[in-house]
């Protein structure tokens, strides 16, 4: 598995909190050749099951990303933003937004 490619692929997908479907689908496809069964639930959690008697493991991680949402456009073109997810306001000054 090419970890560099995996990271590049997954970070290019939109995955804002509440809209993780594409990220979930990507990971489901990555797991599919390695396990016996893959399901994605209503909350976009990916559950992969490999049959056998070996030790059980669980990988638990967030699939969503934090984001900013435009809540208002001022007359001068400047934007008012609201956060989606856990944006720490201390990191916002001098942060590039695109």
Language-model features: locations:
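N-terminal hydrophobic/helix-forming segments and targeting peptides
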Residues: 1-98
